[in-house]
Amino acid sequence: MINSEISSRLSAPSITPLPAPGGSITDISAHGAWFAEYAAYERSLCERDPSPMSLKLRHTELVTGAARGITESEDIPPPMARACLLAAQYHDLGRFEQYRLFGTFRDRDSVNHAELSAFLIEKYGLLTKEAYVARAVLGAVRLHNVYRLPEDLPSDVRVAARLVRDADKLDILRVMDEELSGSGDCPRTVVLNQPDDPSRFSQKVIGCALRGEVASYDDLTSVNDFRLLLGTWIYGMNFDASRKRFAGDGHAKRLVAALPENGPYAEARARVLQSIAEAG
């Protein structure tokens, strides 16, 4: 939940109201325009380096695109597809306030960005004219960052949450590949302030990889742990289309292949690379 102290520090943007839905049921362009205007407003208020906000705006655009690709490949019915697309559009709405107020994207050092995103959706009435999909959208947004989904979710929430979690991870892989495989220095916020220290490794992250399980952010101790964790996401993809794109994009393969071939990561590295290849 978002406490009163954080709530009192949130901005109060004056943004063009959303029109009533019209046209194709999977056309959410009005929501995309609202989101872009909101992001620009938050950027104008930011007294820190605003470039991480730009990364999040681009991330949102690509997650929404990935979600659309999955809904089409998996033949998700149009009403459910709209819920998935809106959840993708707004899943990181809280990231802008999170960064502006706390200077980090690390939830444990600031605020749960998924809860903040859902809070802002309701605060700004973004689903007032979308009542038939509101439960699925809000549920998926709140749950998109949890380690494991609860078992007893309503079916609409479960479908939207699973799909958005896949789409989110697919684009996070792109971001991490661009930052860690590039020639420049990677911003510390992108790697959740983990040290780039080759001598540090997490046996818990390695163990998850060897067991074919998704590793937890809570167990990270270094950038190399982060690389391996990203590779373990192959074990948590929920849709065939997601798994194929995970392998086909090449981002995860590059990230994991950059781990040392010898030493503590060797066996886990080989296991994850094999799993990625088999998904392609």
State what each model feature region is:
Residues 2-9:
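Short, low-complexity S/T/E/D/G/P-rich linear segments that nucleate or cap local secondary structure
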Residues 10, 15-29, 52-61, 65, ...:
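Divalent metal-dependent phosphate-bond-processing catalytic cores, especially two-metal-ion Mg2+/Mn2+ enzymes
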Residues 32-39, 64, 118, 122, ...:
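An amphipathic alpha-helix signature
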Residues 36-62, 96-107:
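Active-site flanking loop/helix segments enriched in acidic
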Residues 53, 103-111, 124-127, 131:
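Short gly/ser-rich anion-binding loops that grip negatively charged ligand groups
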Residues 62-70, 111-125:
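An active-site-proximal "capping" alpha-helix that borders the catalytic cofactor pocket
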Residues 75-86, 126-143, 156-163:
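Acidic/histidine metal-binding catalytic segments
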Residues 81-106, 117, 136-147:
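His-Asp-centered metal-binding catalytic motifs of divalent-metal-dependent phosphohydrolases/nucleases
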